[in-house]
């Protein structure tokens, strides 16, 4: 699928976090097809070089980075700016440590998911805003939530769901704060997506039960997350901010 390259993305830099994973790597390829120069960001163990080889175009870079280490956030945008003006952040990075009942959740489960999914989101968004404002860029931030923010999570994912609810609230609050500077903040809220996070944390029976609740009768592919991200990151959505795009195959209707 080819994305239009006339909506402010072609020739400019974008940052994609979680770029070594299923959704993040698909989003990175979508931006590359739109003509962007992509900075791939993920934890050091992620296969960033493998993803880099799949991108069309030139000027792409990788940056291994633990987003829970806030000191590294400024380096992300400085690195991306080496290639071209940074116009967008697609923050796809997230972690579901494990599925656990409420009684089985440990402090380590809580801390990791809140640190990565909420704390890193807030501070990375703030750093993106500072970079955009300093450079006079009307940039766009696209965060990733989950339908769990609305449902409370399925199958032992209450902490993950809570952290994604925080992403929705912060997206709205940050959108309001950044709007006077012309900087937009939106979120994509996927339902079930065919990635290791989804399929690797459930039994076949649990997965079949989950899929049975999706009106479209299947999981999404990672590539089906790309269109909403490209739209929200580009000037095609220049008057859209503070919104949450529900991409769940009809499972979540509100």
What are the language-model segments listed below?
Residues 1-5, 99, 212, 230, ...:
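Short C-terminal tail/terminal secondary-structure segment
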Residues 3, 7-39:
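Canonical Rossmann dinucleotide-binding motif of NAD(H)/NADP(H)-dependent dehydrogenases/reductases
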Residues 12, 85-87, 132-146, 180-183, ...:
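Active-site loop of short-chain dehydrogenase/reductase
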Residues 100-102, 106-114, 206, 210:
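Substrate-binding pocket helix/loop in short-chain dehydrogenase/reductase
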Residues 125-126, 172:
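A short, exposed helix-loop element centered on a Lys and neighboring polar residues
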Residues 130, 176-180, 238:
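Alpha-helical segment proximal to the catalytic Tyr-Lys
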Residues 142-166, 171-172, 176-180:
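Catalytic loop of short-chain dehydrogenase/reductase
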């Amino acid at each position: 699928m080819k994305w239009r390259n006339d909506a402010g993305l072609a020739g400019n830099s974008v940052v994609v976090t979680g770029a070594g994973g299923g959704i993040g790597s698909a989003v990175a390829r979508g931006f590359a097809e739109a003509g962007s120069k992509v900075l791939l960001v993920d934890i050091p163990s992620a296969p960033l070089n493998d993803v880099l080889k799949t991108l069309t175009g030139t000027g792409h870079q990788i940056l291994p980075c633990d987003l829970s280490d806030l000191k590294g956030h400024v380096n992300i945008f400085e690195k991306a700016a080496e290639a071209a003006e940074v116009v967008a952040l697609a923050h796809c990075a997230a972690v579901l440590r494990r599925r656990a009942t409420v009684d089985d959740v440990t402090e380590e489960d809580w801390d990791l998911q809140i640190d990565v999914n909420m704390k890193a989101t807030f501070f990375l968004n703030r750093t993106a805003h500072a970079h955009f404002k300093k450079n006079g860029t009307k940039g766009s931030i696209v965060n990733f939530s989950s339908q769990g923010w609305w449902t409370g999570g399925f199958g032992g994912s209450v902490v993950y769901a809570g952290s994604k609810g925080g992403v929705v609230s912060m997206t709205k609050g940050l959108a309001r704060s950044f709007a006077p500077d012309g900087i937009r903040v939106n979120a994509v809220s996927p339902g079930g997506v065919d990635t290791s996070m989804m399929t690797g944390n459930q039994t076949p029976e649990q997965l079949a039960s989950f899929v049975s609740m999706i009106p479209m009768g299947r999981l999404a592919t990672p590539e089906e997350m790309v269109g909403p991200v490209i739209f929200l990151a580009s000037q095609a959505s220049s008057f859209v901010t503070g919104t949450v795009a529900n991409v769940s195959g009809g499972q979540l209707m509100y």
